[in-house]
Amino acid sequence: MRKYYYWILLLLFLILSIYIKLIGGEQNIGFNVELFKLINYNQIATLNGLMVFLSKYGREYVWIPVTALLLIFKRTRKIGITLVISFVIAIVLGEVSKYVMAQLRPFNFVNPTYLLEPKPTDYSYPSGHALIVSTGAVTLLLTSPKWMWILGIIEAVLVSYSRVYVGVHWPLDVIAGWLLGSWISFLSVQIESTGPIKKIEQMLKA
């Protein structure tokens, strides 16, 4: 069954990416612009600090320690190794996708945009934050106990939402990040279970 999810996720990401390219950019998709405004224009002052914190620190400051902790213990090392594989693939494919797609961020088109952090200078699509946190969360979903992946999913959703909330990403950037990240998670689980990676695991357990 996982093989079907694998191909569906990749296909959806590719279809969305091609569509965005064909129409000349995310700014030309009406619901994408309106959903951005709905989220960004309805900021709640008491939540701004939390959203900025999640946007700035919800990626590296959560997933690096989580991965390191899982690698330390033999019982969870397999999960940690799968996360490492996932993140390496996500970083590479994420950067390649950004430069292939070359999509500008919403503050270049939507006026006003209520920015809560400095303007990023790189491209927008897909969201690197959404890509990494979704990769981590879905990898946990596929490999770890229920309590662990539930926490991962909650954290990933909040971080992804925060990127639109603070004004630095289109909603479709986040959706694309989740599609690509989820596909990478399925791929990484397959990679971990076969070939040289399995031999490395066995050596570490010895």
Swiss-Prot record:
InterPro entries attached to this UniProt entry: P_Acid_Pase_2/haloperoxi_sf (IPR036938), P_Acid_Pase_2/haloperoxidase (IPR000326)
SMART domains for the chain: acidPPc
Membrane-topology annotation of the record: Multi-pass membrane protein
UniProt-listed Enzyme Commission number(s): 3.6.1.27
SUPFAM superfamilies recorded: Acid phosphatase/Vanadium-dependent haloperoxidase (SSF48317)
Induction info: By polar lipids.
Keywords: Cell membrane, Hydrolase, Membrane, Transmembrane, Transmembrane helix
Subcellular location: Cell membrane
Transmembrane segment boundaries: 5-25, 53-73, 79-99, 138-158, 164-184
Swiss-Prot/TrEMBL catalytic activity: di-trans,octa-cis-undecaprenyl diphosphate + H2O = di-trans,octa-cis-undecaprenyl phosphate + phosphate + H(+)
Highest taxon above the source species: Archaea
Main localization, broad class: membrane
MF GO annotations: sphingosine-1-phosphate phosphatase activity; undecaprenyl-diphosphatase activity
GO cellular component: plasma membrane
Official protein name in the record: Undecaprenyl-diphosphatase
The organism of origin for this protein: Sulfolobus acidocaldarius (strain ATCC 33909 / DSM 639 / JCM 8929 / NBRC 15157 / NCIMB 11770)
